A protein has these predicted regions:
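Hydrophobic alpha-helical segments and helix pairs
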Residues: 60-89
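Active-site beta-loop-alpha junctions enriched in small/polar residues
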Residues: 15-19, 45-51, 79-82, 106-110, ...
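Histidine-acidic metal/acid-base catalytic patches
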Residues: 1-10, 26, 32, 39, ...
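Active-site-adjacent beta->alpha loops and helix N-cap segments on the catalytic face
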Residues: 21-29, 82-92
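N-terminal substrate-binding region of glycoside hydrolase catalytic domains
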Residues: 8-23
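Conserved anion-binding
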Residues: 100-120
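Conserved glycine-rich "GG(E/T)P / GGGxP" loop and the immediately following alpha-helix
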Residues: 53-56, 113
């Protein structure tokens, strides 16, 4: 991360599964200090589902405490499956309303992440005033044979964080080499929505990929 071009970055997102399990807080502290030095916001991708058959993920309180300690702005979870009967939404909302940390759910590449299920979940959470944002992953739709452009058009008003990928034949490509009309999506997004490049990039191509995005954003 120390080699990243400071001028093109507002925020970074780290993935929980990439941390050394015995040194998570030690590594987070180092990353948080780097973010502070560069004026970057820090986002954290939790490798867990927020909802399951027993209700909501009880570990969220622990993750929020860690986020507050290391100045993490946003925690992202996979949606999972909402079981309305077993979920204490009042308790969940109390947790979410008593922190400055934003929490988002993401469309995952399985049966819980289809457009039908995402719309159902987002509408239910919105109707019941549950303080959860939505991370739109532009690539995950391909793995479940759904159209990311249709999904984007139907969900764009709910998006609070955007994960950018370009996909071809279910392989992640460099931008402009896949089938995703990512420029259209960026132009349709609210200008305050953070955009993350969420795919493997060779070190010598990182700046090129970021500059492709910057070129589009500067013309909005």
């Amino acid at each position: 991360m120390k080699s990243l071009p400071e001028k093109l970055i507002d925020s970074i997102e780290v993935r929980g599964e990439f941390f050394n399990e015995g040194k998570i807080e030690e590594e987070l502290e180092e990353i948080a200090n780097l973010c502070k030095e560069n004026g970057w916001k820090l986002f954290y991708s939790v490798p867990q589902e927020l909802f399951n058959q027993e209700g909501f993920n009880q570990d969220i309180e622990n993750k929020i405490l860690i986020a507050e300690k290391y100045n993490i702005s946003n925690l992202k979870y996979s949606l999972g499956h909402i079981d309305i009967r077993n979920t204490n939404f009042n308790k969940l909302n109390d947790i979410l309303n008593n922190t400055s940390v934003n929490v988002t759910i993401e469309n995952q590449p399985n049966a819980n992440g289809t457009l039908v299920e995402m719309k159902k979940a987002i509408n239910y959470l919105s109707d019941n005033h549950i303080k959860l944002g939505y991370t739109f992953d532009s690539g995950n739709w391909y793995w479940i044979n759904e159209n990311p452009h249709v999904a984007f058009d139907e969900l764009k008003d709910n998006i609070s964080v955007y994960h950018l990928k370009d996909i071809k034949n279910k392989n992640t490509m460099m931008l402009n080499d896949g089938n995703t009309d990512w420029k259209y999506m960026l132009n349709e997004l609210d200008q305050n929505i953070p955009i993350f490049l969420e795919y493997g990039i060779d070190k010598d191509k990182v700046v090129d990929e970021m500059e492709k995005v910057e070129e589009v954003l500067m013309k909005r």
